């Protein structure tokens, strides 16, 4: 094909069972301004096959600066395609290395637009997640980042003896506020980002689960966010009143209901 990619390996998606996991680590050399991603792929054994072959996995990527801006970079090692603005890394071995030329240490925005049905294992710090939640130009990753922070905060509240306001970082409140005010973001996506995970989803984190403690943790977080973001929610509720029940206004109604 035009990109000279051997797609035979891609057929493994149809013949090899199991969901691959990408274990990703990174490093940055400030002297050479080189950023490196080390990616290992592993597909767990299934009854019909113990050892799985390496898949061809497209991993869409962006790099985010500490101030939240999208970084420009050049890929200097590793296979890729670049259909539009984002690089799509081609992971085709058990271990792949990708090197980039970029002027500062970035936060990677990985698996943009859910470019492949895989599990990404990358050790994000909460600071990195909040940066992505507030600033990532990719709405899927923005949502994924803030959902992860919600789960971390609720886990801390669940484990604590008392509800602690400091367990809800101000940066989380700021990230949600930025999102709610972002008119470039679809209203339905803003509604999703401002919505905490469900009880059923959160309960999967704890075995066994203390139903009362988990309910208290969820309610505390929601109340804390409601109090801190009262002005934002009120402004959204007033702004997104809709008179017609058509498809184009569905996102606005969802955002209004979230604010309510």
Regions found by a protein language model. Name each.
Residues 12-13, 23-27, 35, 48-52, ...:
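Generic detector of ordered, mature protein regions
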Residues 1-36, 155-177:
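Amphipathic alpha-helical substructures
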Residues 18-21, 45-47, 139-141, 153-155:
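Flexible loop/turn segments at secondary-structure boundaries
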Residues 2-3, 11-13, 17, 48-53, ...:
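Generic structural signal for short, flexible, solvent-exposed coil/loop and linker residues
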Residues 7, 101-260:
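Long, ordered, helix-rich scaffold segments
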Residues 6-7, 19-110, 230:
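Beta-strand-rich binding/interaction modules
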């Amino acid at each position: 094909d035009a990109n000279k990619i051997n797609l035979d390996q891609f057929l493994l998606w149809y013949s090899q069972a199991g969901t691959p996991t990408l274990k990703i680590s990174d490093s940055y050399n400030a002297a050479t301004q080189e950023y490196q991603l080390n990616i290992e792929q592993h597909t767990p054994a299934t009854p019909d096959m113990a050892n799985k072959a390496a898949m061809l996995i497209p991993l869409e990527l962006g790099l985010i600066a500490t101030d939240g801006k999208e970084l420009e970079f050049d890929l200097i090692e590793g296979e890729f395609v670049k259909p539009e603005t984002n690089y799509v890394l081609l992971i085709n071995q058990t271990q792949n290395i990708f090197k980039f030329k970029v002027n500062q240490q970035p936060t990677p925005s990985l698996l943009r637009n859910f470019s492949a049905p895989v599990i990404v294992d990358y050790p994000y710090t909460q600071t990195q997640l909040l940066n992505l939640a507030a600033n990532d130009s990719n709405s899927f990753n923005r949502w994924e980042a803030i959902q992860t922070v919600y789960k971390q905060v609720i886990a801390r509240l669940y484990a604590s003896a008392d509800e602690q306001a400091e367990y809800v970082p101000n940066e989380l409140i700021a990230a949600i506020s930025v999102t709610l005010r972002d008119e470039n973001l679809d209203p339905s996506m803003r509604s999703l980002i401002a919505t905490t995970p469900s009880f059923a989803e959160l309960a999967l984190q704890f075995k066994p689960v203390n139903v009362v403690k988990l309910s208290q943790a969820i309610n505390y977080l929601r109340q804390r966010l409601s109090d801190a973001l009262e002005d934002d929610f009120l402004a959204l509720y007033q702004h997104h009143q809709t008179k017609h029940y058509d498809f184009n206004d569905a996102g606005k109604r969802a955002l209004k209901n979230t604010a309510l």
